[in-house]
Amino acid sequence: MKVSIIGATGYGGLELIRLLHQHASVDIATLHSFSAQSETLATFYPHLKDLEASPLEKINPTEIIEKSDTVFIATPSGIAKDIALPYVDAGLNVIDLSGDFRLKDRQLYEKWYGKSAAPTEYIAKAEYGLAEFREKKETTFIANPGCYATATLLGLAPLTKNKLIDPTSIIVDAKSGISGAGKVPSASTHFTETNENMTLYKMNSHQHIPEIMQQLTKWDESIPAIQFSTSLIPITRGIFTTIYVKPKNPITQKELHTLYESTYENAPFVRIQPENVYPTVKQVTASNYCDIGLAYNEKTNVITIVSVIDNLVKGAAGQAIQNLNIMANFAESDGLRFIPVYP
């Protein structure tokens, strides 16, 4: 399969290149960048010197359609809604890593992203690509989930799909490494601001909130809202999500683990930790795994769920490739069979 990557010089695009080079059924046909053309990636990223010699090109839809079966779009939000359309119309596989096609309500997108929304007919065509819970596996247009949304939804799915929790009780405390803020530097991501520090940001206003709610209410329409906070922590990669919920009825630790293990028994990238063991960010670094730890406090009737991912892999490029595997009828783990980097 021939693929093109639009937005190849961003962190998400770079991860796509790294991972796709390990995929036996995929060849990278073209690489595209808004910020640089006619130079190779190694000009900007010397670690790719022996990996990718193809020059960066301007975006030419006609050429991309001729040379590619699949297009990955790894741009910031607000761009894909315009540039994705020719490839969708041409019938190519299109996987968008930005947030432009995730929300089915255009007004919600414009409220939370502060940008004009994609055309209604294209939003309707896009399937939300939470890979473990894809409903239409034959769909060729995927809105790849956000990193916070992926960790949160995988953590909550077994309980919410079975309507086992008090719908008003969901509290999510999510922490991200600095790469989650993207490649463009800012005052808030400057080394002197982030090193030895922890910063709460976008309190009650992170753009992944409506995305999470959209999926949760598909599973349990009685959920009215979630309390969701996000923090930057001084690590490069990783999402560490701690979720607190109250079950409708008391549940034992064994019942809780059995529920999660049965839900994910056929999911190659979700690993449920043993009882009283909680995952760390390092145990999923540079991998497509989501590791989940569970606890139930009988005294407070609170379930704690710890869900960790690598924001650039399971939270972006890795899940995008997982979605490609599903739509192309490859093995779901093709190109993603590697162990995390440790330490």
UniProtKB/Swiss-Prot annotation:
Query: Which HAMAP family does this one have?
Result: ArgC_type1
Give the GO molecular function terms. Answer: N-acetyl-gamma-glutamyl-phosphate reductase activity; NAD binding; NADP+ binding
Q: Which InterPro entries does the record associate with it?
A: AGPR_AS (IPR023013), AGPR_type-1 (IPR000706), NAD(P)-bd_dom_sf (IPR036291), NAGSA_dehydrogenase (IPR050085), Semialdehyde_DH_NAD-bd (IPR000534)
User: Which Pfam families does the annotation name?
Assistant: Semialdhyde_dh (PF01118), Semialdhyde_dhC_1 (PF22698)
**Principal subcellular localization:** cytoplasm
Family listed: Belongs to the NAGSA dehydrogenase family. Type 1 subfamily.
Keywords attached to this Swiss-Prot or TrEMBL record, sorted alphabetically, are:
Amino-acid biosynthesis, Arginine biosynthesis, Cytoplasm, NADP, Oxidoreductase
Protein's UniProt keywords contain NADP? yes
Reaction(s) this enzyme catalyzes, per UniProt: N-acetyl-L-glutamate 5-semialdehyde + phosphate + NADP(+) = N-acetyl-L-glutamyl 5-phosphate + NADPH + H(+)
| Biological process, per Gene Ontology | L-arginine biosynthetic process
Keyword set includes Cytoplasm: yes
Q: Which GO terms describe its cellular component?
A: cytoplasm
Q: What is the protein's name according to its record?
A: N-acetyl-gamma-glutamyl-phosphate reductase
Q: What is the protein's known function? A: Catalyzes the NADPH-dependent reduction of N-acetyl-5-glutamyl phosphate to yield N-acetyl-L-glutamate 5-semialdehyde.
Enzyme Commission identifier(s)? 1.2.1.38
Quote the pathway field: Amino-acid biosynthesis; L-arginine biosynthesis; N(2)-acetyl-L-ornithine from L-glutamate: step 3/4
Q: Where in the cell is it found?
A: Cytoplasm
Active site at: C147
